[in-house]
């Protein structure tokens, strides 16, 4: 009976914001012992826990600050848990005509909406007089920066990105996730209004409070703010389009070309991007129209190597039951930490298209080694064959298509000519639609 109780309790914890994994440890003796009085065994009834909502007084104060702000900014990281959460965030932004910076811990805000302002994030933070952070993983890093320049005895320098009199509001359930040892708090950031609550659950009350607090005489100013933001959104979209066109026919293949070739094959499907895209300059979230909460599941909670494909396979399993097409851009070094998950996907017939971002290196580390070498006036590259030691995956080059094939997945590549992308991807998409995992190995630019 204790196991059943623990399992239901663990499930309740995992499904209550902030949603995080729960581990159950079963003693070996318990697993091997004979069960007595089987008739008395029972599984407790599961009743979902209502997510915590923000205090009414704090909600009103936050609404007052936002309604009277000249330059309010909304920053969301893991705010929208559901389709309803995306809709609520749009309502709040439209009520204020406030720009939204989506940090993409989840798909919080449609990038097709003119209030989506990721491209201007740093500038908007610096201009804001009121900033509201919704489920931010790292509020300090949102409003501050670190200059890794070797000053201060090698520690670097910290700098604030906000005005001295800017007001900060936080709604986050992470404050309720205090653990016995390791924490997820990041650096401490002083804020003016702080609510230990689930942001999505608090948004309806906040939206209503904002509407009541908006001064009648500010309607024209708010509309003008929205028009200015819309103009900036259009200009940013055009800059992104132009930037994506650079090196379109280059070899190795540009990551923007790869992203758009994939989109051309899946745009008419009910698709879901189930991997992070930071390593390929975030082209999918910058170029693909994303307006559904499952269009992007968000990136990892940290920077752990080996996260990508296991997370993508798990999301693809959930999407299989929903009838969605799952696609994952898979970094090469990341895959080598857990290649066996390809077998898992093939064994359980989990439909997933994985497109390799094969830059033949741990490029995050390559850039860091180069930066440190510059600082210390050292050579970062050691000969033609060795290159930057410990950061390249070449000599020999890994054939990821053969690796995937050996695990039972459909595969194609390595592809080095961008003209070969479309036909290879088309066949891979058909394999995934037939219910199997597929991997296309694409040799790419570093970012």
Question: What is each stretch, according to the model?
Answer:
Residues 122-127, 203, 282-446:
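Thiamine diphosphate
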Residues 1-5, 102-230, 425-428:
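Glycine-rich, acidic loop regions that bind phosphate or pyrophosphate groups
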Residues 12-18, 58-73, 92-95, 125, ...:
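Glycine-rich phosphate/diphosphate-binding loops that line cofactor/substrate pockets in enzymes
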Residues 34-47, 234-246, 292-295, 380-385, ...:
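Gly-rich Lys/Arg/Thr-decorated short loops/hinges at beta-loop-alpha junctions or inter-strand turns
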């Amino acid at each position: 009976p204790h196991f059943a109780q623990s399992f239901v309790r663990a499930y309740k914890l995992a499904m209550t914001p902030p949603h995080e994994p729960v581990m159950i440890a079963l003693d070996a003796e318990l697993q091997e012992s004979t069960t007595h009085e089987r008739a008395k065994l029972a599984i407790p009834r599961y009743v979902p826990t209502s997510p915590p909502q923000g205090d009414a007084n704090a909600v009103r104060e936050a609404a007052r600050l936002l309604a009277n702000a000249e330059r309010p900014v909304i920053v969301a990281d893991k705010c929208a848990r559901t389709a309803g959460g995306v809709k609520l965030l749009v309502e709040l932004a439209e009520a204020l005509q406030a720009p939204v910076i989506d940090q993409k811990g989840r798909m919080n805000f449609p990038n097709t909406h003119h209030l989506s302002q990721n491209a201007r994030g740093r500038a908007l933070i610096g201009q804001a007089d009121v900033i509201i952070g919704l489920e931010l993983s790292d509020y300090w890093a949102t409003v501050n920066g670190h200059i890794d320049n070797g000053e201060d005895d090698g520690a670097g320098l910290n700098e604030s990105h906000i005005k001295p009199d800017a007001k900060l509001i936080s709604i986050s359930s992470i404050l309720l996730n205090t653990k016995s040892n390791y924490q997820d708090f990041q650096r401490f950031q002083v804020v003016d209004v702080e609510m230990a609550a689930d942001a999505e659950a608090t948004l309806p009350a906040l939206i209503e409070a904002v509407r009541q607090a908006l001064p009648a005489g500010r309607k024209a100013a708010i509309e003008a703010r929205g028009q200015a933001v819309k103009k900036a959104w259009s200009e940013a979209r055009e800059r992104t389009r132009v930037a994506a066109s650079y090196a379109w026919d280059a070899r190795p293949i540009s990551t923007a070309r790869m992203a758009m070739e994939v989109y051309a094959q899946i745009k008419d499907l009910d698709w879901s991007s189930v991997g992070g895209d930071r390593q390929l300059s975030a082209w999918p979230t910058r170029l693909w129209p994303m307006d559904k909460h499952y269009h992007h599941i968000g990136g990892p909670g940290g920077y752990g190597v080996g996260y990508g494909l296991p997370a993508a396979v798990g999301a693809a399993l959930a999407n299989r039951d929903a009838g969605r097409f799952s696609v994952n851009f898979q970094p090469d070094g990341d895959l080598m930490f857990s290649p066996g998950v390809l077998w898992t996907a093939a064994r359980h017939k989990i439909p997933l298209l994985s497109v390799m971002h094969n830059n033949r290196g741990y490029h995050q580390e390559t850039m860091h080694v180069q930066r440190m070498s510059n600082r210390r006036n050292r050579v970062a590259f050691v000969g033609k064959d060795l290159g930057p030691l410990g950061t390249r995956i070449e000599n020999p080059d890994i054939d990821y298509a053969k690796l995937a094939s050996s695990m039972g997945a459909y595969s194609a590549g390595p592809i080095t000519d961008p003209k070969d992308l479309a036909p290879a991807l088309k066949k891979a998409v058909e394999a995934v639609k037939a219910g199997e995992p597929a991997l296309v190995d694409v040799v790419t630019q570093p970012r």
